[in-house]
Amino acid sequence: MNGGILLSAPLYQMIYTDLKKQIEKGNYEINDLLPTEKELAALYSVSTITAKKALDLLKEEGYILRKPRKGSVIISNRKNESTF
Protein backbone atom coordinates (compact mmCIF):
# COMPACT_ATOMS: atom_id res chain seq x y z
CA MET A 1 0.00 0.00 0.00
CA ASN A 2 1.25 3.47 -0.76
CA GLY A 3 -0.45 5.21 2.17
CA GLY A 4 -3.41 6.31 0.06
CA ILE A 5 -1.30 8.44 -2.28
CA LEU A 6 -2.28 8.11 -5.93
CA LEU A 7 0.74 7.57 -8.12
CA SER A 8 -0.87 8.22 -11.48
CA ALA A 9 -1.10 11.63 -13.13
CA PRO A 10 -4.43 13.44 -13.58
CA LEU A 11 -6.35 12.46 -16.72
CA TYR A 12 -5.86 15.87 -18.34
CA GLN A 13 -2.08 15.50 -17.85
CA MET A 14 -2.12 12.07 -19.52
CA ILE A 15 -4.10 13.44 -22.49
CA TYR A 16 -1.75 16.43 -22.73
CA THR A 17 1.27 14.12 -22.73
CA ASP A 18 -0.24 11.86 -25.38
CA LEU A 19 -1.14 14.76 -27.67
CA LYS A 20 2.25 16.41 -27.14
CA LYS A 21 4.03 13.19 -28.14
CA GLN A 22 1.85 12.92 -31.26
CA ILE A 23 2.66 16.52 -32.20
CA GLU A 24 6.40 16.05 -31.60
CA LYS A 25 6.43 12.80 -33.62
CA GLY A 26 4.89 14.59 -36.58
CA ASN A 27 1.48 12.93 -36.44
CA TYR A 28 0.14 16.47 -36.65
CA GLU A 29 1.68 19.10 -38.93
CA ILE A 30 1.94 22.85 -38.37
CA ASN A 31 -1.49 24.44 -39.10
CA ASP A 32 -3.35 21.13 -38.57
CA LEU A 33 -6.42 21.22 -36.36
CA LEU A 34 -6.55 19.01 -33.30
CA PRO A 35 -9.80 17.22 -32.49
CA THR A 36 -12.34 19.41 -30.70
CA GLU A 37 -12.84 19.29 -26.93
CA LYS A 38 -15.95 17.19 -27.51
CA GLU A 39 -14.10 14.79 -29.83
CA LEU A 40 -11.19 14.44 -27.40
CA ALA A 41 -13.62 13.81 -24.54
CA ALA A 42 -15.21 10.97 -26.51
CA LEU A 43 -11.85 9.60 -27.67
CA TYR A 44 -10.38 9.48 -24.16
CA SER A 45 -13.68 8.80 -22.34
CA VAL A 46 -13.39 11.94 -20.19
CA SER A 47 -15.42 15.10 -19.65
CA THR A 48 -15.04 18.08 -21.96
CA ILE A 49 -13.60 20.01 -18.99
CA THR A 50 -10.78 17.45 -18.76
CA ALA A 51 -10.15 17.69 -22.51
CA LYS A 52 -10.14 21.50 -22.25
CA LYS A 53 -7.51 21.38 -19.49
CA ALA A 54 -5.27 19.23 -21.71
CA LEU A 55 -5.65 21.67 -24.61
CA ASP A 56 -5.01 24.62 -22.29
CA LEU A 57 -1.69 23.03 -21.26
CA LEU A 58 -0.69 22.58 -24.90
CA LYS A 59 -1.48 26.26 -25.46
CA GLU A 60 0.55 27.32 -22.41
CA GLU A 61 3.49 25.27 -23.68
CA GLY A 62 3.36 26.93 -27.11
CA TYR A 63 2.19 23.95 -29.16
CA ILE A 64 -1.25 25.20 -30.19
CA LEU A 65 -3.28 28.33 -30.73
CA ARG A 66 -6.90 28.12 -29.56
CA LYS A 67 -9.33 29.89 -31.89
CA PRO A 68 -12.92 30.29 -30.68
CA ARG A 69 -15.37 28.47 -32.96
CA LYS A 70 -12.45 27.33 -35.15
CA GLY A 71 -10.55 24.86 -32.98
CA SER A 72 -7.02 24.27 -31.80
CA VAL A 73 -4.34 24.82 -34.44
CA ILE A 74 -0.83 23.37 -34.23
CA ILE A 75 1.68 26.23 -34.28
CA SER A 76 4.80 24.37 -33.14
CA ASN A 77 6.04 20.81 -33.02
CA ARG A 78 8.52 21.58 -30.24
CA LYS A 79 8.15 23.48 -27.00
CA ASN A 80 8.48 27.25 -27.39
CA GLU A 81 9.09 27.17 -31.15
CA SER A 82 5.93 28.72 -32.52
CA THR A 83 5.75 30.04 -36.04
CA PHE A 84 4.27 33.34 -34.86
For the regions a protein language model found, what residue spans apply to each?
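Short, hydrophobic-biased segments on the C-terminal half of alpha helices
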Residues: 54-56
